[in-house]
Structures are given as C-alpha cells and as structure tokens.
A protein has these predicted regions:
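Ligand-site clamp/hinge motif
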Residues: 193, 221-267, 383, 392-394
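Aromatic- and charge-enriched surface segment that lines or borders ligand/interaction sites
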Residues: 80-125, 151-153, 245-248, 295-297
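Gly/Pro-rich hinge or "lid" segments in bacterial periplasmic/extracellular proteins
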Residues: 68, 168-228, 233, 347-348, ...
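Detector for C-terminal structural segments
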Residues: 211, 215, 308-336, 371-383, ...
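Surface-exposed binding/hinge segments that line
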Residues: 83, 93, 130-183
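N-terminal lobe/hinge region of extracytoplasmic solute-binding protein
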Residues: 33-86, 116, 123, 198-204
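Alpha-helical secondary-structure segments
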Residues: 31, 107-114, 147-153, 203-204, ...
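A structural "hinge/loop" feature
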Residues: 37-53, 75-78, 104, 157-174, ...
C-alpha cells in the first residue's frame, strides 16, 4: 500500500545515516534522552503516560512496589509488611526510619493525606480510586491511620489483590510530604500549583531542576531509606526526534534512549556498543472516536471504521519494537483473555455500512495524534485506508496536552492514542481503563478513564465486570471475562485496540541494572556504569 512505501523509504534513509564518534558521559551521571512532550506536570495526582510516570517513580515512593519482572509479585516499599483480612481490608505497617527529602519522617498521616488529596483534586490519579468506589466524600469511611499503620477497607466488592496493587501505582498512591506541601498551599489548592513544578517525596532522587520540554535533573537522595542510588545525578533531556536520540547515543552524549523509531532501533541493534531491551509493557495503541459526535453514535459508522484499519500492515511495518498485534481490550496471558478476532480491511463492506448510516459519500473528520513515532505513522496509515471509503481525515499533530487535552475534555472527534491500564496482571486493570464507565455525564469528569473520555457507556458491561471481579471460582471467572470481551466486540465500541505496547529501550553497553517496567515505574536507583 502507498503508506507502506513511505515508511519503507524513511527506514532506508535512517539506516544509511552515518554513526557518530563516541564520547563518555560522566561516570556518576545517567543521561536519558526522551520526548518530554507528555511531561506536563510533576504533581503525582495529575500525571499520565509512560514518561511522566517514570520520573515520578524516582521522586516519590509508594507503600508497595510491583515487581518489574514477575507480574504476580508485590515487593515492600514504604510499607515493610501488610495483611489482608477476610473482609478484604488491607493493613499496611510503615517501615521505620524512612524520611522525605526535606528530612521530615514519613508517617501514616502523610499516606492518608496524599490519597485524600488525590481524590479531592479529582485529577487523573483519582480515576483509579473512583473505579473501586472511593470518592472524596466517602474516603473517610474506608481509609484510616493508627500509629504506624494504614488500613483501607473495600468500598465495594473487589479482589483484594487489586486493592494491594493500587498502592504500587505512583499516580494513585505516591506518598507526598504533607508538611512541606501545605507550606506552599495557595488559596486552599492543597499545593497543586507548587507541586506542578516542584517535588516533595521520599524517593531515591530529589528534584533539582525542571525546564519544560528542555531538561529535568534529579539528584541522589543520600539519606534514602532503601537501596542507595549508584548515580549521583539523573538528567532527562528533551529529544522528540528519534534520529537525534540515536545520534546522541552513538556519540555517547546520552546513556539511555527512550522512544526510538523502528529503523533506529534496528540500526542500533547491530552496534556492539549498545544494548536493546525489549519488554512487555502495559496498555495498547488504539484508534478511538467520540460517541458524543452524532456520526459516531451510530454503530454502523463505528463498524465501517473497524473495516478500514489495516491491522496487519500497521503491526508489520510500523509497530515492531513498539507493540505487538492485539485487538482485544484485555492483555494476552491474563485470565479469560481471548484470541484476536480476524479483522481485515474491507472497503466494500465499509461503504455499504456508511451508506446505511446516511453517509454514502463519507465525511470529513479531524484525526488527532502525537507528533512522534509510532503515532504519526499509524495515523497516516489509517488516513489512507479511511480515504478509500470517502472518509477524509485531517491529521492534527501536537504535543501531549494539545492532543490528549481535548480527549480528556471530551472535545475531540477521532484520535490515535496509547493507554488502557494493564499495570496489574488482571483483566480488570484493562477493563477499568477502557471499558468500565461508572458515570457518563460530562460533569462526572472521570478524565482518567478512557471509556468516559470516549463517551462509551454500557450498563450491562459495567455489571458484568463488577460480578467477574468478585467471582472466586477460577473457571467461572474465566468464562465471565470471556463473555465481557464478546459483548464489547458486539457493541462495536468507541475504541479499537490495534497493538499491545512493547517498550524498547536502548542504552550504552556499560549501563548496568536498567530494568524496564510494565507499569512504567522504571526506578533508576539500581543503575550503575561499568567502566
């Protein structure tokens, strides 16, 4: 197809680029090249996306840490231990001696305040809590501190293992230094303005400098309670262009490169001076429409679009090193996960459906996408196949908030995006992000839930997911999650997964201890340089 030829030409040009001359970054500093377009804030309650989560995971701690390799394993964090009661309540015991970078001790009060703050602000991180029934006006009934212990009771029937996992997610449960934060409160904002550009955590590193879309510098916290960081400093440098990151890595100006294009990863994989780490991540690359739009309320229009995406071609040409083909809203390998449906491009069928819906000549639509790989290439591929049925897609590219902002406000038409949970090895993690929508009203403002953003709502699916979550019989639960995926497909939802996210990170061969994380919480305290 025409779009494939364009991608192939770009690949050939990139692979032919000459390598630079190697230099060395300082032995006690880790320099990371990545796009900072989606790092819009440093407030844990407001972050979203891989890059911002990775930064926050090094500035703040959580009560537990989800193991980077074994998805079924939960490790101690600020909590040294925990117990799960028969009624599903989880009680954490704080470790002794942990302090914030300010020197203030980490207390149970800090933990409780951080969670209540998250809910009261109602930003992205609150979406996780609200999907489990916790609200700003009811959290006092379920969350409490007693000495060095924190207890959370279930607000609604749920799997306690998922409750436990929430406390390993920085966006939901990063522990903030209450005393320091409130000393910078303005007009009762709970330090929202200050924490947007500052940090008050107990993580392995402290914030030294942040220049938006330029540079972010972290400095080792020498009194860190856990494993002492090997690096004195971590420097994130804004590099939205893949070839720039590749050349800087080859020259030795950066140690780690995140978000490289497929051609650049392919070229670097042949270089003995670097290593490529490919790890399963979480979430999906997807195409979504807004069901607030009259055209996309019609299931025939949505079904037509399903027939106008070249899933095989996109995954073969664009997605290697970014993702692997996945068309279901549940990650492979979890309980009840179904094989992919056999969706193919069928222009004739799409035209028939559009005519039935009242659009025999198609229509025009704005297609939002980030201006970086693989989003822009995927949007171009979709634009080409949509055009075959008369749908004229105008691609609008931009940085993070320019693209995801309209989606969070439910003021978009069509978008190529990335997301969808999966930070916990459980189908509910994906369903919570993509399928379940507790309240479809505009004023619900559930901006952390993609189902709400797309205005997709099905009461029956909500009920099915709630019942599957609490089913303790393995075979019954498996069948229930299979039925959920079948109904989702039948409804022709507003969001169609295209590819399951794979994280490919390239780093200098002398960098040791770097470990990608499926939940994006890449902690850098274990990283060293072998020179």
């Amino acid at each position: 197809m025409k779009w494939m030829r364009h991608v192939a030409l770009a690949t050939a040009l990139t692979l032919s680029a000459p390598a630079g001359v190697w230099a060395d970054t300082p032995p006690d500093q880790l320099v990371v090249g990545l796009s900072m377009n989606n790092i819009l804030t440093l407030d844990p309650a407001a972050i979203s996306g891989r890059e911002a989560t990775g930064v926050i995971a090094n500035l703040y701690d959580t009560l537990v840490e989800l193991d980077a390799v074994d998805k079924t394993k939960v490790n101690p964090g600020l909590a040294s231990s925990w117990t799960i009661a028969d009624d599903g309540a989880v009680t954490f015991t704080l470790r002794e001696g942990a302090t914030f970078t300010s020197g203030n001790p980490v207390t149970a009060e800090d933990v409780v305040w951080s969670i209540k703050r998250n809910l009261s602000l109602g930003l992205v991180g609150a979406g996780v809590w609200s999907s489990f029934g916790y609200k700003a006006n009811n959290i006092d009934q379920f969350l409490s501190a007693n000495g060095n212990q924190i207890t959370i009771k279930p607000a609604q029937p749920t799997d306690p293992q998922l409750t436990l996992a929430i406390f390993g997610k920085p966006d939901a449960s990063a522990v903030i230094d209450k005393k320091t934060a409130l000393s910078h409160e303005t007009n009762g904002d709970q330090a929202a303005a200050w924490l947007k550009i500052n940090a008050a955590g107990s993580g392995a590193f402290s914030l030294t400098r942040w220049s938006s879309n330029e540079m972010l510098i972290l400095t080792r916290f020498d009194d860190y309670w856990g494993e002492k960081p090997q690096m004195k400093r971590v420097i994130y440098r804004h590099m939205p262009e893949s070839q720039t990151k590749r050349l800087m890595l080859e020259k030795g100006d950066v140690d780690v490169a995140i978000g490289l294009s497929v051609p650049d990863i392919a070229a670097l994989s042949k270089n003995p001076e670097v290593e490529v780490q490919r790890t399963p991540s979480s979430g999906f690359y997807f195409l979504a429409v807004s069901m607030k739009d009259e055209r996309f309320k019609n299931p025939d229009v949505r079904l037509a679009i399903r027939h106008l995406v070249d899933y095989d071609g996109i995954n073969k040409v664009i997605m290697p090193n970014y993702g692997t083909k996945r068309l279901r809203p549940v990650a492979e390998g979890v309980i009840g996960s179904l094989p992919d449906p056999d969706y193919k491009v069928d222009v004739a069928k799409a035209k028939e459906l559009l005519a039935k819906a009242g659009y025999p000549d198609g229509f025009s639509v704005r297609l939002l996408t980030l201006n970086e790989p693989p989003f822009a290439d995927t949007a171009t591929a979709i634009q080409a196949t949509l055009a075959q049925a008369g749908i004229k897609a105008e691609i609008v590219q931009g940085a993070g908030d320019q693209i995801y902002g309209p989606m969070r406000e439910r003021k978009f038409e069509m978008i190529v995006g990335r997301g969808g949970g999966g930070q916990e090895p459980h189908p509910h993690s994906n369903l919570r992000a993509l399928v379940i929508n507790p309240n479809n009203a505009d004023d619900a403002k559930l901006s952390g839930i993609i189902g709400w953003r797309t205005s997709f709502y099905d009461e029956q699916l909500n009920d099915m997911a709630a019942k599957a979550l609490v089913e303790r019989d393995h075979d019954k639960q498996k069948a229930m999650y299979e039925d959920i995926q079948k109904r989702y497909e039948e409804l022709v939802p507003a969001l169609q997964p295209i590819s399951a996210v794979v994280d490919s990170v390239v780093y200098r061969a002398d960098v040791k201890g770097y470990q990608n994380h499926y939940g994006w919480t890449v902690r850098l305290r274990s990283v060293s340089k072998q020179r």
